[in-house]
Amino acid sequence: MKTLPFNLVVNPVSFGQVSTAILRELKERKQDIILSPIANQFDLSAQPENPEFQEWLQEAIDGFTSKHSRKNRVFKLWHLNGSLESFSDEQVLFSFYELDNPTREEINIVKNNYKVIFSCKETVEKFQSLGCKNVDYLPLGFDSHNFYKTNKQYFTDDRITFTIVGKFESRKNHEKMVKAWLKKFGNNRKYSLQCAMWNPFLKPEQNNQIAQGLMGGQNYFNVVFSGYMPKNEMYNDYLNSSDIVLGMSGGEGWGLPEFQSACLGKHAVLLNASAYKDWANDKNAVLVEPSGKRDVYDGMFFHEGQPYNQGQIYDFNEDDFISGCEEAIKRVESSRNNSEGEKLKDKFTYSKMVDSIVSHM
């Protein structure tokens, strides 16, 4: 068995969570690897303690500089911005792209990698249409190590609980979702809304201001904003406490929180666009059709005229969204468990994902 080199970020946010799941699968296979952490980020604090896994990773890190040859392909998981740089003459890059107008810089980066893999078919088709013949599709898997049913009772009444998950940003249409939900269901004891939109790239006071702004200066007894969750165990508990997850993002590379929730048997209301389409259907989710597109620029994470992250995202009609919520309520009233959603965890696995990764190396 040959030694496989990896260039990954190991941290608590989405890129790091995916990287860690890949590494864990490789260890279970007893695959010999060497690892160079991107930006020297090596933070397993969100993961359950596992000294053996951490020791295995540290050995892989310690061996990278002495064992690696640029003649060997390296698997890298990172943004397009920063992926022209590589440790290999033939880099295999896995990246996420959520918009619709690749810049000349982004196109050039893709073309200069040996292989670029995206977890969204729409993204693959976009880059192929722009002359990138080296792109491929690979879906993510369900992280069964961190996410599982707790079988706890979280509430003493029969409320139906909605959740919105994912760091706050304009691209995810969070503001429009929350305000539409409040207009329809705010201060209704039959329903509650849990928002886990803490953005670790913003200051705590900025996150608090966002929450206050979404409430429009009013008080709603059936809405809760959660703070940062430093442990995946807490995050798993949060997902388990919900009945319906809401995902109306205008552009997604996969939609991890919504996907994990559906795999746990939670009902979902999703925008039928971008990567949601690659795993959601009308059996495992309530699908809302996009109403069109809008510019992504928000003056915070997306700035017009820059060499990266340019274009538009999908939008939705508020009435269509509320209709989707009402349909999801009916599904919950029929059964709290989304059995079709649970099937996703067997269809999309990290075992299958790593099979594909290894085949490219």
Question: Where in the sequence are the language-model features?
Answer:
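Extended catalytic core of nucleotide-activated donor transferases of GT-like folds
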Residues: 42-127, 233-234
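N-terminal pre-catalytic "stem/leader" segment of glycosyltransferase-like enzymes
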Residues: 1-71
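Nucleotide-activated donor-binding/catalytic signature segment of Leloir-type glycosyltransferases, i.e.
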Residues: 205-233
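Conserved donor-binding/catalytic core segment of Leloir-type glycosyltransferases
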Residues: 4, 154-172, 178-181, 193-195
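Short hydrophobic beta-strand element within catalytic cores of glycosyltransferases
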Residues: 267-270, 286-288
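A charged, aromatic-enriched C-terminal amphipathic alpha-helix characteristic of glycosyltransferases
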Residues: 312-323, 330-359
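Acidic anion/phosphate-binding donor-loop and adjacent secondary structure
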Residues: 104-105, 142-159
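Aromatic "clamp/platform" in nucleotide-sugar-dependent glycosyltransferases that forms part
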Residues: 250
